[in-house]
Amino acid sequence: MDYKYIIKKIDQIIDQKPKVCLILGSGLNDFCNQLKNQKKINYSDINCFKKNKIEGHSKEFVFGYINKIPILVANGRLHYYEGYTFEEVGVLIKVFNYYKPSKYIITNSTGTVNKDWSIGDFMITQKFLDFSFIKNNKHRYYYLKNQINIKNKKLHYGTYTYTIGPTYETKTEIEEIKFLGGDVVGMSTFPEYMMCNYLKINPIILSCITNYAAGIESTPVKHSHVINNAKKSKLNFIKLLTEIVLLQNNT
């Protein structure tokens, strides 16, 4: 995937280099409504991207301002399960890195295995648990530099567990993930983090908890529930993400 071509297309809609670059996860696209003087380009207008359409992902780049801070948003991410390689999923980070922003933010919608946490809560990732078994048959941990310290009763700090998807985990898998120390489970973000790691970037990773993982509750997990619960959390999510955007530069 030619990231330089993607940059060339983005340069057609921006009037200055972004100081904040961020990726929005499933159902979290309402944050873009906060941006002033918006300019957009659809992924479909950039020939590098597949034509896949996943509910909750708008698949567009949006440029705009919050408090005069220029922000570039990837409104909708790529996934390994769509047929992209890890490196291709990480292309959004390579694009962001070209602009050398002061802050990289990656967001996602996740399920939690922690019964003490509630749907509508949020989590900052401090550690990854790779539960994909793509490269070998063992799980592995990756530790992040903790960049922010926001006090919010709905905000937690913990471990993001990466699984391949697109199917949700079994009850047995969730029990093992909990035993291994996972707090939330998702099908994204880890490939982008690996590109950040390669480029020596310290991202802020924010999860919106949209459901309990399989087996925690009696009702089955559905993507439609994830989207609906993300929408219900949108006001708190927008408030928290805006607070993170406006924090002093810390990368």
Model-derived features with residue positions:
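Metabolite-binding pocket within alpha/beta catalytic cores that recognizes anionic/polar moieties
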Residues: M1-H139
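Zn-dependent metallopeptidase/amidohydrolase metal-coordination segment
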Residues: M187-H225
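Generic hydrophobic/aromatic pocket-lining and core-packing "Φ" positions
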Residues: I93, I174, F190-Y193
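Non-catalytic positions within long, well-ordered alpha-helices that form the structural scaffold/packing
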Residues: F96-K100, K178, N197
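Short acidic/polar active-site loop segments enriched in Thr and Asp
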Residues: S102-K103, D183, N202
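His/Asp/Glu-rich mid-to-C-terminal helical/loop segments that flank catalytic regions of hydrolases
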Residues: A214-T251
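Polyanion-binding loop/helix "lid" in catalytic or ligand-binding cores
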Residues: Y141-I150, I164, K171-I174, A230-T242
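Active-site/ligand-binding-proximal alpha/beta "capping" segment
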Residues: I148-G186
